[in-house]
Amino acid sequence: MRRRRRETPRDVIDAALNDANETVLDECEQSRVVQAFEASTAAQRRFASAFFGSLGISLGVVYFGAHCACGAFGGGDVWARSLLHRWYYVEGARARAFVTMCDWASAAAYSASGLACARLRGDAYGGATATARAGLVCGVVASCAWWALGVWGSGTFDAGSASRGAAPAAWAWTCAHVVRAQVDAARAVETLRSKMYAHKSL
């Protein structure tokens, strides 16, 4: 049977890391485990970046084009036929301006949250976290504004309007959770690597 290759005595490594547990894997095997864990987290990060990033940005662009451009800027019958504005139909310039603000905030929430996930592909974890927070703020503002409009504008605030108003905040929270989980996983890999190779300085 071929002997395991040990580049550094395990007792020296364990003493340096204050590890009193029984050694199961040698250094080469542990290195392969770390590499497999790193490859797995990187694959998950790429999937989250591609799926949530592209979907969020697309939702923001489509939302703005279908609802904000056609509804808020069209006026008249186009306004009434807008898919979402049928549920929040209001009259008056000030009310329409408020709905336009809701549209802008919703589009910003979808786009910023998607952009935060898209930034996971690189190493800009701090930038992804900050962008996700901005998207979450926009989502909360948009949802609260839609709910306020449902009560103040149309006067018919039911379960349907509540769920539709909650959509921007729910999407932003989901993306923020994905970003946080992926960033924590990436940092866990870095911490594990630093502990694994701490014995190199002995």
Describe the function of each predicted region:
Residues A93-A116, A134-V140:
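Generic alpha-helical transmembrane segments
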Residues T156-L202:
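Terminal transmembrane helical module of multi-pass membrane proteins
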Residues V34-R45, V78-C102:
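Juxtamembrane membrane-interface segments at transmembrane-helix boundaries in membrane proteins
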Residues M1-R32, A185-L202:
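Non-transmembrane, juxtamembrane loop and terminal tail segments
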Residues C68-A72, R119-G122, W147-T156:
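Juxtamembrane "helix-exit" motif on the non-cytosolic side of transmembrane helices
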Residues C68-E91, V183-M196:
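Interhelical loop segments of eukaryotic multi-pass membrane proteins
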Residues A130-W152, A169:
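Hydrophobic alpha-helical membrane segments
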Residues I13-V62:
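Cytosolic juxtamembrane helix and N-cap/initiation of the first transmembrane helix
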